[in-house]
Amino acid sequence: ATELGIYVLPMPFTMEGQEFYEDISLTQAQFYEKLEGETEIATSQPSPEAVTSLWDKVLKDYDEIVHIPMSSGLSGSCQTAMLLAEDYDGRVKVVNNQRISVTQRQSALDAKALAEAGKTAAEIEQILMDTKMDSDIYIMVDTLKYLKKGGRVTPAAAAIGEILRIKPVLQIHGEKLDAFAKARNIKAAKTLMVNAVKKNIQENLGEIPAADAKNAPWIAMAHTQNE
């Protein structure tokens, strides 16, 4: 990412009283190994010092920064960044366009392309904000264990769901993470998600000519454990 002029601020998490950073002090394989071993994991956000330290470093080589944090509905890091940016005289634009995971990555790539096209940080911020409601994420979880840990489902509902082998499908649209549907197996859950994506494309874009690559929808799939 750095080679592209994109800088990544790692998100910290705590396990067994120790603070770690993904792919810096702990690999993804080690993370999932500990997760499956019932290790208690708590997520956090970068410290204000970590944020401003990165900004100060980048501003030595660039005039402006477009900072794209995790969605404000899912992390307090967005509000923190907005407050910190007030001390940078407009040189740092914090874009709260409600992105996470693959959509956040795409926003970073879009911002880079816009910068290369000559857009200012303020113009990039406006373009990204104008399209903040134009994405949906659908998530299928194989177990209710972690939703129960996070308080998103009650222990009783999780127990019933496990017995019935229910595979919940969640949706992120804007800042909200909501229940979308329930399936009785992985295949049915995948079908639900594919149909939901098709419906989104049809409702938002209609029929797109095969030759119209410019307006083609962007679709990505992500898997846990790098599968």
Positions of the model-derived regions?
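N-terminal glycine-rich anion-binding loop in soluble enzyme alpha/beta folds
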Residues: 1-50
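A short glycine/small-residue-enriched secondary-structure motif
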Residues: 27-31, 55, 60, 82-87
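Glycine-rich phosphate- or other oxyanion-binding loops that anchor nucleotides, phosphorylated ligands
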Residues: 37-72, 79-80, 125
